[in-house]
Protein backbone atom coordinates (compact mmCIF):
# COMPACT_ATOMS: atom_id res chain seq x y z
CA UNK A 1 0.00 0.00 0.00
CA UNK A 2 2.78 2.43 0.92
CA UNK A 3 4.67 1.54 -2.26
CA UNK A 4 1.64 2.30 -4.43
CA UNK A 5 1.14 5.63 -2.66
CA UNK A 6 4.77 6.58 -3.30
CA UNK A 7 4.51 5.46 -6.94
CA UNK A 8 1.40 7.58 -7.46
CA UNK A 9 2.97 10.75 -6.06
CA UNK A 10 6.19 10.03 -7.93
CA UNK A 11 4.14 9.82 -11.15
CA UNK A 12 2.47 13.17 -10.50
CA UNK A 13 5.73 14.89 -9.56
CA UNK A 14 7.59 13.43 -12.53
CA UNK A 15 4.98 14.82 -14.92
CA UNK A 16 5.44 18.27 -13.41
CA UNK A 17 9.23 17.99 -13.64
CA UNK A 18 8.91 16.95 -17.30
CA UNK A 19 6.59 19.93 -17.88
CA UNK A 20 9.15 22.31 -16.35
CA UNK A 21 11.91 20.83 -18.50
CA UNK A 22 9.78 21.18 -21.64
CA UNK A 23 8.95 24.77 -20.69
CA UNK A 24 12.65 25.57 -20.32
CA UNK A 25 13.79 23.67 -23.40
CA UNK A 26 15.12 26.08 -26.03
CA UNK A 27 13.27 26.36 -29.31
CA UNK A 28 14.54 27.81 -32.58
CA UNK A 29 13.91 31.54 -32.84
CA UNK A 30 11.41 31.13 -35.67
CA UNK A 31 9.32 28.63 -33.72
CA UNK A 32 9.46 30.32 -30.31
CA UNK A 33 5.97 31.72 -30.83
CA UNK A 34 4.55 28.19 -31.21
CA UNK A 35 5.82 27.01 -27.84
CA UNK A 36 2.95 25.36 -25.96
CA UNK A 37 2.20 25.94 -22.30
CA UNK A 38 3.37 22.55 -21.03
CA UNK A 39 2.93 23.34 -17.36
CA UNK A 40 -0.64 24.52 -17.89
CA UNK A 41 -1.45 21.41 -19.95
CA UNK A 42 -0.12 19.02 -17.30
CA UNK A 43 -1.70 20.95 -14.44
CA UNK A 44 -5.01 21.14 -16.29
CA UNK A 45 -5.00 17.39 -16.85
CA UNK A 46 -4.37 16.60 -13.19
CA UNK A 47 -7.00 19.09 -12.00
CA UNK A 48 -9.56 17.49 -14.32
CA UNK A 49 -8.52 13.91 -13.55
CA UNK A 50 -8.01 14.01 -9.76
CA UNK A 51 -9.16 17.38 -8.41
CA UNK A 52 -9.18 16.04 -4.85
CA UNK A 53 -5.39 15.48 -4.98
CA UNK A 54 -4.11 18.16 -7.38
CA UNK A 55 -5.88 21.48 -7.24
CA UNK A 56 -5.36 25.02 -5.98
CA UNK A 57 -2.51 24.31 -3.55
CA UNK A 58 -0.50 22.51 -6.20
CA UNK A 59 -1.24 25.33 -8.64
CA UNK A 60 0.05 27.90 -6.18
CA UNK A 61 3.24 25.93 -5.41
CA UNK A 62 3.91 25.27 -9.10
CA UNK A 63 3.33 28.95 -9.86
CA UNK A 64 5.81 29.97 -7.16
CA UNK A 65 8.31 27.47 -8.52
CA UNK A 66 7.78 28.82 -12.02
CA UNK A 67 8.33 32.38 -10.75
CA UNK A 68 11.57 31.33 -9.08
CA UNK A 69 12.79 29.52 -12.21
CA UNK A 70 11.96 32.43 -14.52
CA UNK A 71 13.16 35.08 -12.11
CA UNK A 72 9.92 37.00 -12.50
CA UNK A 73 8.05 38.84 -9.78
CA UNK A 74 7.32 36.32 -7.06
CA UNK A 75 3.66 35.35 -6.97
CA UNK A 76 2.53 36.41 -10.43
CA UNK A 77 2.29 32.91 -11.90
CA UNK A 78 1.14 31.54 -8.54
CA UNK A 79 -1.76 33.99 -8.43
CA UNK A 80 -2.83 33.41 -12.02
CA UNK A 81 -2.46 29.62 -11.95
CA UNK A 82 -4.24 29.19 -8.63
CA UNK A 83 -7.19 31.41 -9.56
CA UNK A 84 -7.62 29.86 -12.99
CA UNK A 85 -7.30 26.30 -11.67
CA UNK A 86 -9.83 27.13 -8.96
CA UNK A 87 -12.37 27.96 -11.65
CA UNK A 88 -11.50 24.79 -13.56
CA UNK A 89 -11.66 22.65 -10.40
CA UNK A 90 -15.10 24.06 -9.57
CA UNK A 91 -16.34 22.99 -13.01
CA UNK A 92 -14.32 19.80 -13.46
CA UNK A 93 -17.38 17.54 -13.85
CA UNK A 94 -18.68 19.60 -16.76
CA UNK A 95 -15.27 19.95 -18.41
CA UNK A 96 -14.35 16.29 -17.97
CA UNK A 97 -17.50 15.12 -19.78
CA UNK A 98 -16.96 17.25 -22.88
CA UNK A 99 -15.59 15.68 -26.03
CA UNK A 100 -11.85 15.77 -26.54
CA UNK A 101 -12.02 18.14 -29.51
CA UNK A 102 -14.19 20.58 -27.54
CA UNK A 103 -11.78 20.33 -24.62
CA UNK A 104 -9.03 21.27 -27.08
CA UNK A 105 -10.91 24.42 -28.04
CA UNK A 106 -11.35 25.29 -24.37
CA UNK A 107 -7.64 24.65 -23.75
CA UNK A 108 -6.85 27.27 -26.41
CA UNK A 109 -9.11 29.69 -24.56
CA UNK A 110 -7.73 28.78 -21.10
CA UNK A 111 -4.09 29.13 -22.15
CA UNK A 112 -4.75 32.45 -23.85
CA UNK A 113 -6.62 33.78 -20.80
CA UNK A 114 -3.84 32.60 -18.46
CA UNK A 115 -1.20 34.32 -20.60
CA UNK A 116 -3.32 37.46 -20.80
CA UNK A 117 -3.81 37.50 -17.01
CA UNK A 118 -0.07 37.07 -16.45
CA UNK A 119 0.50 40.03 -18.77
CA UNK A 120 -2.10 42.16 -16.96
CA UNK A 121 -0.62 41.42 -13.53
CA UNK A 122 2.91 42.14 -14.74
CA UNK A 123 1.71 45.28 -16.55
CA UNK A 124 0.14 46.56 -13.33
CA UNK A 125 3.42 45.96 -11.46
CA UNK A 126 5.86 47.29 -14.04
CA UNK A 127 6.18 47.86 -17.76
CA UNK A 128 5.32 44.76 -19.75
CA UNK A 129 4.49 44.19 -23.39
CA UNK A 130 1.90 41.78 -24.76
CA UNK A 131 3.06 39.75 -27.72
CA UNK A 132 0.44 38.54 -30.15
CA UNK A 133 2.47 35.33 -30.49
CA UNK A 134 0.83 34.17 -27.24
CA UNK A 135 -2.20 33.37 -29.37
CA UNK A 136 -0.15 30.97 -31.50
CA UNK A 137 1.22 29.25 -28.41
CA UNK A 138 -2.34 28.83 -27.16
CA UNK A 139 -3.30 27.20 -30.46
CA UNK A 140 -0.30 24.88 -30.23
CA UNK A 141 -1.39 23.92 -26.71
CA UNK A 142 -4.88 23.17 -27.98
CA UNK A 143 -3.51 21.02 -30.78
CA UNK A 144 -1.38 19.05 -28.33
CA UNK A 145 -4.13 18.59 -25.75
CA UNK A 146 -5.64 15.33 -27.15
CA UNK A 147 -2.25 13.61 -27.21
CA UNK A 148 -1.24 14.92 -23.79
CA UNK A 149 -4.62 13.91 -22.37
CA UNK A 150 -4.57 10.39 -23.82
CA UNK A 151 -0.95 9.73 -22.85
CA UNK A 152 -1.40 10.95 -19.29
CA UNK A 153 -4.68 9.06 -18.89
CA UNK A 154 -3.05 5.84 -20.04
CA UNK A 155 -0.21 6.27 -17.54
CA UNK A 156 -2.61 7.31 -14.76
CA UNK A 157 -4.70 4.19 -15.29
CA UNK A 158 -1.62 1.98 -15.41
CA UNK A 159 -0.47 3.37 -12.05
CA UNK A 160 -4.08 3.10 -10.74
CA UNK A 161 -4.16 6.73 -9.71
CA UNK A 162 -7.68 7.93 -8.89
UniProtKB/Swiss-Prot annotation:
Keywords: Cell inner membrane, Cell membrane, Cell shape, Membrane, Transmembrane, Transmembrane helix. InterPro entries: Cell_shape_determining_MreD, MreD_proteobac. Pfam families: MreD. The keyword Metal-binding does not apply. The keyword ATP-binding does not apply. GO terms for biological process: regulation of cell shape. GO terms for cellular component: plasma membrane. It comes from the Bacteria. It is found in: Cell inner membrane. Its main location: membrane. Signal peptide: none annotated. It is a multi-pass membrane protein. The chain crosses the membrane at residues 5-25, 30-50, 56-76, 105-125, 132-152. Belongs to the MreD family. Involved in formation of the rod shape of the cell. May also contribute to regulation of formation of penicillin-binding proteins. NCBIfam families: shape_MreD (TIGR03426). This is Rod shape-determining protein MreD. The lineage of its organism: Bacteria, Pseudomonadati, Pseudomonadota, Gammaproteobacteria, Pasteurellales. The gene is mreD.
Amino acid sequence: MQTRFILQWFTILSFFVIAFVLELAPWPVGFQMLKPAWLVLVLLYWVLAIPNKVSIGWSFLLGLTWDLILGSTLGVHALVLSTSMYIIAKNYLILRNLSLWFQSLLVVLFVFIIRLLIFLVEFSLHTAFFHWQAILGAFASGLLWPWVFLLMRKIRRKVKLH
